């Protein structure tokens, strides 16, 4: 039952923080989410990519081209892992700096969320109470009909359906009325929350700290680019044998086709 109330609350509270509004645990940091996603994605690409390379090399075309992709796959995977290791610390430093610079803003927003939560909690409690009462009333009305069905014959199914339909419709109507009432009560607080968030962001936009942050972000991105250059060069060098094999196979195929045409 609590899940129903929490779901309804989320429907009426806007903003990216709404999904953490009722959470007791600390949300995962942006860096952790990005790092986990990148790791899973790259590992999946690496594993599935090797499978595709194996299938290609065992095919008729792969045997004819003889690119020897698998011979270079491990070195390429090692180069990609090295690239991740070199870029990782710089990226983590960037996210850590971002979280540190916005700690004050996040504290103020959390304070606003807590204040709004306290104001809307009575309405949520009332909604839960009325919903539970309606569900219990519906259960009491349906229970005798279930007993009647068990004791009756199959032909009474249609009669039971006719009796249940009005009760189900009544429950839906009452639930809809409760939701409408809850929406009416929560609307002012939802507007208040949006206004507070807009004010916080406007204050951040007008403050000098935003310009400082933009400069620092540019600096971090430049450092990230410099860190990535050696690893990207290693990746390019690792791809050269594959490209060279591909070029040789292409020209070999062209020469063979030319010879066949001239002999005909």
UniProtKB/Swiss-Prot annotation:
It comes from the Eukaryota. It is found in: Secreted. Residues 1-18 form the signal peptide. Glycosylated. GO terms for molecular function: cholesterol transfer activity; phosphatidylcholine-sterol O-acyltransferase activator activity; phospholipid binding; protein homodimerization activity. Its main location: secreted. Sequence repeats lie at residues 67-88, 89-110, 111-121, 122-143, 144-165, 166-187, 188-207, 208-229, 230-240, 241-264. GO terms for biological process: acylglycerol homeostasis; cholesterol efflux; cholesterol metabolic process; lipoprotein metabolic process; phospholipid efflux. GO terms for cellular component: chylomicron; extracellular vesicle; high-density lipoprotein particle; low-density lipoprotein particle; very-low-density lipoprotein particle. The modification Methionine sulfoxide is found at residue 109. Keywords: Cholesterol metabolism, Glycoprotein, HDL, Lipid metabolism, Lipid transport, Lipoprotein, Oxidation, Palmitate, Phosphoprotein, Repeat, Secreted, Signal, Steroid metabolism, Sterol metabolism, Transport. InterPro entries: ApoA_E, Apolipoprotein_A1/A4/E. Residues 67-264 are annotated as: 10 X approximate tandem repeats. It holds the Pfam family Apolipoprotein. The keyword Repeat applies. PANTHER family: APOLIPOPROTEIN, APOLIPOPROTEIN A-I. Belongs to the apolipoprotein A1/A4/E family. Participates in the reverse transport of cholesterol from tissues to the liver for excretion by promoting cholesterol efflux from tissues and by acting as a cofactor for the lecithin cholesterol acyltransferase (LCAT). As part of the SPAP complex, activates spermatozoa motility. Homodimer. Interacts with APOA1BP and CLU. Component of a sperm activating protein complex (SPAP), consisting of APOA1, an immunoglobulin heavy chain, an immunoglobulin light chain and albumin. Interacts with NDRG1. Interacts with SCGB3A2. Interacts with NAXE and YJEFN3. This is Apolipoprotein A-I.
């Amino acid at each position: 039952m609590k899940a129903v109330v929490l779901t309804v609350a989320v429907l009426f509270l806007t903003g990216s923080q709404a999904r953490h509004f009722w959470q007791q645990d600390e949300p995962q940091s942006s860096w952790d989410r990005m790092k986990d996603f990148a790791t899973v994605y790259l590992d999946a690409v690496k594993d599935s990519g090797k499978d595709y390379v194996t299938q290609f090399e065992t095919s008729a075309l792969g045997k004819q081209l003889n690119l020897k992709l698998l011979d270079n796959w491990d070195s390429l995977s090692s180069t990609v892992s090295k690239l991740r290791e070199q870029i990782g610390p710089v990226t983590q430093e960037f996210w850590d700096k971002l979280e540190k610079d916005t700690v004050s803003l996040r504290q103020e927003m959390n304070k606003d969320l807590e204040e709004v939560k306290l104001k809307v909690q009575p309405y949520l409690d009332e909604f839960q109470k009325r919903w539970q009462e309606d569900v219990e009333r519906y259960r009491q009305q349906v229970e005798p009909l279930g007993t009647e069905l068990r004791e009756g014959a199959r032909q009474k199914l249609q009669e039971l359906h006719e009796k249940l339909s009005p009760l189900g419709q009544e429950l839906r109507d009452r639930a809809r009325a409760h939701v409408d009432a809850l929406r009416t009560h929560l609307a002012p607080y939802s507007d208040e929350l949006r206004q507070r968030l807009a004010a916080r962001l406007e204050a951040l936009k007008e403050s000098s700290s935003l310009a400082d942050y933009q400069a620092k972000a540019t600096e971090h991105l430049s450092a990230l680019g410099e860190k990535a250059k050696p690893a990207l060069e290693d990746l390019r060098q690792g791809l050269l044998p594959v490209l060279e094999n591909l070029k040789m196979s292409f020209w070999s195929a062209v020469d063979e086709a030319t010879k066949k045409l001239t002999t005909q």
